[in-house]
Amino acid sequence: MQIDVLSLFPNMFEPLRESMIGKAIERELLNFDVVDYRSYSHDKHHHVDDTPYGGGAGMLLKPEPLFEAMDGVNERHPGPKRVILMDPAGKKFNHQAARALSQEDHLVFICGHYEGYDERIRTLVTDEYSLGDYVLTGGELPAMVMIDAIVRLLPGVLGNDESAHTDSFENGLLEYPQYTRPPEYRGMKVPEVLQNGNHQLIARWRQKESLRRTYLRRPDLLKTITLDQTAQKLLREVKTEEATKAAEARLKNQS
């Protein structure tokens, strides 16, 4: 995969070259370039912004630097690419979007700054994404989050490809609880089922606890997926168990 980032602050992306993404670059699974589009400015002061027509607060990014930076990307890497604009008005980024984008050969991230963009810049863009209903100083942090989420899904990037397939949200559910040694610590024990070596029971426990965690923490996710009969049965068990716990807690508080 080729990833290009257009940013006024290229040094912000250096930490991405560490750890997992750094290994992806070393293994030649990823080419990662950051372009400072200030270098495409047309005036001696290297301005890339200007006041908006019609008045208003703040400054807008001018079209020329970003259009010409994209020209440079297209010259170096001809061919189709997804061009992503980080914008609060974009669609919400999620795991499904990360999975889809990880299938692409070339991604370009445009990171804005200041009050906003000249509207003509949007003609360069294939996708607009937001991390949530809040505004950040620039597009760099959202781009880094997206890049990390996407690159870890590339085959061969994680030490164990199964890790990506058991992540939270991969099957629409939150991930089940996990434990390592020691089997008991400060009175907290690892569930016996995880220690008995029965893989069928372990798989059932994990599915049930994944459903439980989703039901308790993100019940909205259960409305967006279709559960098979086994999962539906496990979810009914979870709801019964949690209702019993809640009733017992109420009685305890009343006594």
From Swiss-Prot:
* GN (gene name): trmD
The record's InterPro entries line, in alphabetical order, gives: Alpha/beta_knot_MTases, tRNA_m1G_MeTrfase_C_sf, tRNA_m1G_MeTrfase_TrmD, tRNA_m1G_MTases_N, tRNA_MeTrfase_TRMD/TRM10
Keywords assigned by UniProt, alphabetized: Cytoplasm, Methyltransferase, S-adenosyl-L-methionine, Transferase, tRNA processing
- SUPFAM superfamilies for the chain: alpha/beta knot (SSF75217)
| Gene Ontology MF annotations | tRNA (guanine(37)-N1)-methyltransferase activity
One GO cellular component term of this record is: cytosol
Which GO terms of type biological process are on file?
Answer: tRNA N1-guanine methylation
Look up the EC number in the record and give it. 2.1.1.228
Catalyzed chemical reaction(s): guanosine(37) in tRNA + S-adenosyl-L-methionine = N(1)-methylguanosine(37) in tRNA + S-adenosyl-L-homocysteine + H(+)
Annotated positions binding S-adenosyl-L-methionine: G112, L131, G132, D133, Y134, V135, L136
Q: Mainly resides where?
A: cytoplasm
Q: What class of enzyme is it?
A: transferase
Keyword Transferase in record: yes
Q: Which Pfam families match?
A: tRNA_m1G_MT
Task: Quote the function comment for this protein.
Answer: Specifically methylates guanosine-37 in various tRNAs.
Assembly, in brief, is: Homodimer.
Official protein name in the record: tRNA (guanine-N(1)-)-methyltransferase
Query: What family is this?
Result: Belongs to the RNA methyltransferase TrmD family.
Q: Where in the cell is it found?
A: Cytoplasm
The reply to whether Methyltransferase figures as a keyword in the UniProt entry is: yes
| Signal peptide per UniProt | none
